[in-house]
Regions:
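Pan-zinc metallopeptidase signature
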Residues: 140-151
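Extracytoplasmic/secreted proteins, especially bacterial periplasmic and envelope-associated proteins
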Residues: 18-21, 74, 78, 99, ...
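Short pre-active-site segment immediately N-terminal to the catalytic Zn-binding motif
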Residues: 62-78
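Auxiliary, metal-adjacent structural segments of Zn-dependent hydrolase domains
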Residues: 1-59
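Active-site recognition of the HExxH zinc-binding catalytic motif
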Residues: 77-90
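Anionic, Ser/Thr-rich low-complexity intrinsically disordered regions
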Residues: 51-54, 80, 99, 109
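Post-HExxH zinc-binding segment in Zn-dependent metallohydrolases
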Residues: 97-132
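Flexible, surface-exposed loop/gating regions in the mature catalytic domains
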Residues: 91-95
Length: 151
């Protein structure tokens, strides 16, 4: 697994250290999520926006500062969520849109429970409807939504 800090977004050594801690939390508390991450994602890098980047090789999970600066349990659960999108992509399933995000959210909720996340994170995740990708509220995921991301 390549871990790449970027001083424009998040500097090393903090980035590498916390990402490794999140990966280790998945390894010890959520082996399935760890397996998906290690098996399907080749790189985790600091970026302006969080998400699964299928347009680069290897498949990459981008992590923005807002996500990085959250708790270790939240960061680990986001890595799990994004790795599920990598699994969907590799299995030639739909990896964007409402149903894909609902699946990712359910998976993230399961992982939050497995890794002992605070109840506040679990309750927050339970309230998510899967439409967080549609930031301009036009009913579809497009580049405008991507560029509006602050997480």
């Amino acid at each position: 697994m390549q871990i790449e800090a970027d001083v424009r977004y998040i500097a090393d050594p903090q980035f590498t250290k916390k990402i490794n801690e999140a990966i280790d939390l998945l390894r010890t508390q959520s082996p399935c999520a760890y397996g998906n991450l290690i098996g399907c994602v080749g790189r985790i890098r600091a970026a302006q926006r969080s998400g699964t980047n299928i347009n680069v090789t290897p498949l990459t999970v981008d992590i923005a500062s807002a996500t990085f600066n959250a708790s270790i349990t939240w960061l680990a659960s986001v890595l799990a969520h994004e790795s599920l999108h990598a699994v969907q992509f590799l299995n030639k399933q739909t990896y964007t849109g409402l149903e894909s995000e609902k699946e990712g959210n359910a998976y993230q909720l399961m992982v939050l429970r497995q890794i002992g996340a605070p109840q506040s994170e679990i309750v927050y995740m339970m309230k998510q409807t899967g439409d967080h990708f549609d930031l301009n509220k036009n009913g579809k995921y497009d580049w405008d939504d991507y560029y509006r991301r602050t997480y």
